[in-house]
Amino acid sequence: MIFWTDPNKPDSADELIAGAEKYLRPIPGVSSFHVGRMVKSHRDVVDQTYQVALNLQFANKRLQDDYQLHPLHIEFVEKAFKPNCQRAVVYDFE
């Protein structure tokens, strides 16, 4: 996922990252978890318009589907995503 945080809220990226650590990392079925800030680059090909990225890996599609419905994921959306983000893009792939 790629997140564009609220520019009117200076701590929004930190709050989003903390929320991902708190709510998403412990969800069963997540085999790999990485959340972090955008890294500045001198290369024109690198998108530098976002503030935070999240990469999660699952062993199979069923675990990913279960993750979407997990109460901690729903809590993350309500308590960390909605208060801090203006936009997000999701890329699901094998």
Where are the language model's segments positioned?
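C-terminal structural segments of small proteins and small subunits
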Residues: K61-V89
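Short S/T/G/P-rich N-terminal loop/turn motif that feeds into the first structured element of a domain
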Residues: M1-Q51, N55, A59-L69, D92-E94
